[in-house]
Amino acid sequence: MPEDTKLSHYDDIGNASMVDVSAKQDTRRTATASAFVELSAAVMAALPANPKGNPLEVARIAGIQAAKRTAELIPMCHPLPLTHVDVQVDLVENGARITALAATTGPTGVEMEALTAAAVAALTVYDMTKALDKRIVIRNVQLESKTGGKSGDFSRGSF
């Protein structure tokens, strides 16, 4: 995949600027992002037995909501008509693995929406479990793959 040689969100004199995508064709675009929330054994054991509900389901819904509100949080991010958002939160060894998928048909990509969904889902896991342990760590919020657009497809590899 070709890499740009300059940052895209600045004008010719260095001021922050929203990229003009008005001349770009609408194409199908997808992005998948992930995050990992490192949890203690005590937190892992408490999750299935929580009488107040499932914190992982709350995190999943928070991630979906976050994807839909990304343009309100990231200053130069375009508001996009998302056609699909899916967030999965799975318990794995030592924590919760979050995977977020965003899709649109539009003039710009959905990487920020997928990343925001994964990050907010991870923050929500923290929020919902912090009463049990303050040493929770959020790691590796990262883009796993993207499709569509002039920069082409990207895949980090197996995840």
Predicted regions: what is each one?
Residues 2-78, 83-159:
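C-terminal binding/interaction regions
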